[in-house]
Amino acid sequence: MSKLYLMSLGCNKNLVDSEIMLGRLSAYELCDEPSKADVLIVNTCGFIDSAKKESINAILDLHEQRKKDSLLVVTGCLMQRYREELMKELPEVDLFTGVGDYERIDEMILKKTNLFSNSTYLQSENSKRIITGSNSHAFIKIAEGCNQKCSFCAIPSFKGRLKSRQINSIIAELKDLVARGYKDFSFIAQDTSSYLFDKGEKDGLIRLIDEVEKIKGIRAARILYLYPTSASEALIKRIIASEIFVNYFDMPLQHISDNMLKIMKRGTNSTRLKEMLNLMKSAPNSFLRTGFIVGHPGESEADFEKLCEFVKDFGFDRVSVFAYSKEEDTAAFDMEQVPFKVINKRLKIIEKIVDEVIEKSFEKEVEQKRLVVCTGESSEGEFFIAAKDLRWDREIDGEILINESECGNLEMGQIYECEILQNLDKKLLAKALRKVDAN
């Protein structure tokens, strides 16, 4: 049997596309060593400069490790965005494709030909997919593309405009995954709260929540990448009212200064953002994640200080911060740029604030009782079982270490009620109290 090595870079949306490719290539034996693979695939990220460099380095590194007569295939956002340049500059690569042909990857390899469709690939209920990384959790991509016009983001230039999956397609995939033992789902898109806007439906995500709740066997779900202008008060209240969707609110804000929100073309203001955030925060057991960009063109010292004060005071649970990356095909590209030294200085300042904010979030979990799902052996060694809070997204929000159990041996993928005993440098030590369900 021929062997396949696949490297998926970038976001969880890319991961879903990689899993689609694995589904099409199920005849191959997956391997962990590039040097033994007959086919090597890199699913690239082309979002910001650091991601582009990571993708190029990964391609060159795999070329160095590959065996003679193997095929090196490069796909994904970087290829879609820089197709002509990369095909000229990467003679190491055998086959190229972009973001439109994931379900034709088997055909492409068989015929040894490049493929570049004009449209972005959109998953259907007939798409074969092999879930990786978990036996209980899966990401569900509900749309592709984006209609927003943020000044710093090039994604619409290579992913295109919003294209939503049909609800029946999503429900069919969920039912199949539940039948295979999956019970925990994260719904993703570039802008999830705009789901079905392209079909003229303004409450599409609410309708999807209604349909998801009818499926027996789903234990938890969360929605990632809410966009401030497309996420309505009604949507937030519907999530809060749900018995399946946890009160996990992931909304990248990018800034809080009204001046910067206008420059960044975010379509909203700080007053509306704070009202929405306070509504989210009022939910029982709420968990708030966001992200900010520092050093965007036009950011004054006063704007930056306003951002720092807000991050320090609001009480987010998780915050990601990024240095502005100058990207072609964006409105900010031709604006007067903030000097690199200033950007780096600001990044270090806000990273310190964020570190303290996240530490407080972990600390407030001590003595709480939480539902967790066991995920495997801990990174801290054989004496701990790793778990995640059922509210959390997979991998990015933290790790719970269980070293005591009042309910016998713990099963992977099973849900338990745990008491949080201690915060160990952003890892929570816990004791399992009881098994929550028998599924």
From Swiss-Prot:
This is Ribosomal protein uS12 methylthiotransferase RimO. Catalyzes the methylthiolation of an aspartic acid residue of ribosomal protein uS12. SUPFAM superfamilies: Radical SAM enzymes. [4Fe-4S] cluster 2 binds at residues 146, 150, 153. Residues 2-114 form the MTTase N-terminal domain. CDD domains: Radical_SAM. GO terms for biological process: tRNA modification. [4Fe-4S] cluster 1 binds at residues 11, 45, 77. It is found in: Cytoplasm. GO terms for cellular component: cytosol. InterPro entries: Elp3/MiaA/NifB-like_rSAM (IPR006638), Methylthiotransferase (IPR005839), Methylthiotransferase_CS (IPR020612), Methylthiotransferase_N (IPR013848), Methylthiotransferase_N_sf (IPR038135), Ribosomal_uS12_MeSTrfase_RimO (IPR005840), rSAM (IPR007197), rSAM_horseshoe (IPR023404). Keywords: 4Fe-4S, Cytoplasm, Iron, Iron-sulfur, Metal-binding, S-adenosyl-L-methionine, Transferase. PANTHER family: RIBOSOMAL PROTEIN S12 METHYLTHIOTRANSFERASE RIMO, RIBOSOMAL PROTEIN US12 METHYLTHIOTRANSFERASE RIMO. One of its GO terms (molecular function) is aspartic acid methylthiotransferase activity. The lineage of its organism: Bacteria, Pseudomonadati, Campylobacterota, Epsilonproteobacteria, Campylobacterales. Residues 132-363 form the Radical SAM core domain.
